[in-house]
Amino acid sequence: MRLQSLFASALTLGSCVAQNSTNGTWPIHNNGLTTQIEWDHYSMIVNGQRFFLWSGELHYWRIPVPELWVDVLQKIKAAGFNTFAIYTHWYFHNPNPETLDFENAAHDFTKIFDLAKELGMYVVFRPGPYVNAESNAGAFPLWLTTGAYGSLRNNDTRYTEAWTPFWEKVASIVAPYQLTNGGNVLTYQIENELGSQWRGTPSKKIPNLSSIQYMEALEASARAQGITIPFQANDPNLNSDSWSKDFYDGYGSVDIYGMDSYPACWTCNLTECDSTNGAYKPFNVIDYYDHFQEISPTQPSFLPEFQGGSFNPWGGPEGGCPENSPADFANLFYRNNVGQRVTAMSLYMLYGGTNWGWLAAPVVATSYDYSSPISENRMINDKYAETKLFGQFLRVAKDLTKTDRIGTNQTASTNPNIVYSEIRNPDTNGAFYVTIHQESTVGTREEFYINANTSKGEFTIPQKAAPIVLNGFQSKIIVTDFSFGSHSLLYSTAEVLSHSIVDEEDILALWMPTGEAGEFVVTGAKSGKVSSCGGCSSVGFYPQGDDLLVTISQSEGISILTFDDGLRVLVMDRSYAYEFWVPVLTADPFSPANETVFVQGPSLVRSVAYSSDGTILELTGDNNGTSTQIEVFPPKAVSEVTWNGQSIKTSKTDYGSLIGSLTAPALDSLTLPEISGWKANDSLPERLSTYDDSWWVDANHMNTSNPTKPETLPVLYIDDYGYHVGNHLWRGRFEGSASGVYLSVTGGRAFGYSAWLNGEFIGSYVGAAYPDTGELTLSFGNLASSNSTNILLVLQDNSGHDETSGALNPRGINNATLISSSAKNFTSWKVTGTAGKPDTAIDPVRGILSEGGLYAERLGWHLPGFDDSEWSSASPSNISSSAGVTFYRTTVPLAIPTGLDVAISFTLNASPSNAALRALLFVNGYQYGRFSPWIGNQIEFPVPPGILNYDGDNVIGLSVWRQEEGGESMGVDVGWKITEAFASSFEPIFDATYLQPGWTEERLQYA
């Protein structure tokens, strides 16, 4: 019946919407449930206004401290974004088939919706159920990975029954927060990068019914739970052409089509992207225009994931690869997208966060910094500042929301090395000339002019100033007929930064790279003057008919030009533009210009408000200098400025601004106490033959649902026994005098394992960055007993489940074969892992992904409140020469002064630097670092407030698994440091007790 209805709908709806508009107009679409959110060929239309969706991604589950969400979101808003995107995480909320958790601590994500409303941003909500995200099994619940639910992401009824409770609950939670219900959730994504609508070549449109029926079921379920906002989808690349109603109106297609792109590769291992992008070339731009014209011509060109950075795989470069997508990348690629008529774009990632616990897929380690504009430690960087310049421009460039592409790759009039795309608003005639190098991979310094068509004719610009310059891997957007408030620019070769209306008068901000020249024409102006020259030169005012042509060169600083009609124009270089802010007085995501204030100088401006009588301008934000100049451009009624609640002394300038100075403590004098006072205990008693494993799970399955069958029996796949993350322990028994064992163990990239027979170490697979399986033939020597039961312990690491179809790839022992044995096989196996019943978290606050199965973890040695008074003193700097696991623990107080936001990172340094060991860092019960110096890539581990107590005691734990016996001494030096500090209105000191549940006697049963 379902199949019949599918084909019936397809026949009724037809196959493809015409790609060209009729009668010069494009149809305006909605989903039939609301007209609050509509769209057409040009852009989205929200509450009747055209809208450039400018968004960035963050994951609340990668920053599991709800008190920190406001900090990150304030920084997103301050950079000019009007939207942010979030994934949910199925496993984080659904630890077993019977349990859904949307209440405990960070599991309750509704605070994010409240903050979006308060700050004035829309939300692109992406609930999966599969999300990828370099997360363990792509965020599938790991109980789903046994094969018992089929191959996943299809119409298999077993899989449908698995996702339905989670999917329905999420939709019911989100429904009240939709724009249509007074909230700010704008769109709702169905699945993630599921480019499988078609079988074979997409142009043949042979339906893939399994995927189609899956998508239709997800859509119907969400609608049944009250989701009325538009559905969106994100095609994984340019090749799969899936889920656009323009390409095929039916077969599960969604309301708004999108396509993801990572032109500089999503990983620091650039070869992984060759099959998608071709061989890597730095700064090689990609054409999207033709794709969107073919696949979604009556919809806005939408990039739901556009590169904000890239993740760092195991063995990658220390600190990631920010050089692959630096500030210049943001400058060039985001502008180039505008030149291709993209009017909806979300950066992945804008804030990456941390793969704490066992959140990560095997492709990535603890850090998920992603070289993002907002770093893992929540601090902003040069890429953030460069992105902010673009975002502030988008906020005021209203004509961008409706443009036609007039020409592309047009050569600059004087330099064939520069080309530009011209896009023009058909209603206002406002145009944007997006300039780039003819070969974007070439970053030479080039001077050029362009032929610009304006409402007053064609001009070769600039007319009087020095030529336009592209210096490096950059782009510039040259505007013509640019309207702002009651004014307009006929053109400008200096880039537009922002626009504010104060006391019903316009203030325009322009910027240019340090030392370059710009030229602009103010329509209707008769005269102008330099009211303040902060680094300006070659300033000229030239009447041109009814208009005024202005030339200026700008070194480091900010200059203010005033005009006879009341217009003020701020011209600044890049360095000053980086510290130029446009806070908004309203919670309207459109950020109207008459609700903004210009502020220059601080490291960050978080908010702005007026006192009730309008005489005090109240600013909050961050600054990091002992003396930082601040200049604000408020209404005339303002006579006082406060910064973070404190009045600052200001003086008024002739051109209407107020200038003052911000002070901050001497932040470079901040210090942290030494991490010392370590105590230690053996964390691997399971290696001993006397250890009692009677409570462990019997690993006795003789068959498995997993499509990959083991080479020996019983089945020793960890997920089949209800354990899924971290370290697992297998104990196999046999009788007789075997001489050795062959082991084949799978644990994902960068995993490892070690083995002991009757308490004695026999060998390790130390691991490598890419292999996910390790094979060893281990000799027992004279350790096996022919007269008693022998016990083999295998301690296995598990770096996570693979993504997409690889989620079913098993983890565990594929083959355990005794060698030269009088017994043919092991007589029995037992297994244990994370404390709690299988598939059940003992710690619902930190959640199912927080800890693995080490003895120390099971017994809660990493938790606050555990009594270590009987332990002996020992330092991880000099560990035992025996292979095994030792747990180290200490308590260190912190006393960060109030009024400061401080980023703290732990440092782990091995001796020797490539030591064959594996260490886990725990902070107040949270695992915040996986350290494998043999494999490499990370020695600094940021830990945020809320995990760390900034004003109180901190329990720090370190498990050290030595994988080699004897030889040179080994150790791990544990330190910490302040990486950045600011005087801030954000207060990182708060009561985090609820996030840090302590030790309980319940743990003792897992000894």
UniProtKB/Swiss-Prot annotation:
It catalyses: Hydrolysis of terminal non-reducing beta-D-galactose residues in beta-D-galactosides. Belongs to the glycosyl hydrolase 35 family. Glycans are attached at residues 20, 23, 155, 208, 269, 409, 453, 594, 624, 681, 703, 787, 815, 825, 878. Gene3D superfamilies: Beta-galactosidase, domain 2, Beta-galactosidase, domain 3, Galactose-binding domain-like, Glycosidases. Keywords: Carbohydrate metabolism, Disulfide bond, Glycoprotein, Glycosidase, Hydrolase, Polysaccharide degradation, Secreted, Signal. GO terms for molecular function: beta-galactosidase activity. It comes from the Eukaryota. It is found in: Secreted. GO terms for biological process: polysaccharide catabolic process. Its EC number is 3.2.1.23. InterPro entries: Betagal_dom2, Betagal_dom2_sf, BetaGal_dom3, BetaGal_dom3_sf, BetaGal_jelly_roll_dom, Galactose-bd-like_sf, Gly_Hdrlase_35_cat, Glycoside_Hdrlase_35. The keyword Ribosomal protein does not apply. Transmembrane segments: none annotated. One of its GO terms (cellular component) is extracellular region. Substrate binds at residues 87, 132-134, 192, 262, 370. PANTHER family: BETA-GALACTOSIDASE RELATED. Disulfide bonds join 268-321. This is Probable beta-galactosidase B. Cleaves beta-linked terminal galactosyl residues from gangliosides, glycoproteins, and glycosaminoglycans. The active site is at residues 193, 305. The lineage of its organism: Eukaryota, Fungi, Dikarya, Ascomycota, Pezizomycotina. SUPFAM superfamilies: (Trans)glycosidases (SSF51445), Beta-galactosidase LacA, domain 3 (SSF117100), Galactose-binding domain-like (SSF49785), Glycosyl hydrolase domain (SSF51011).
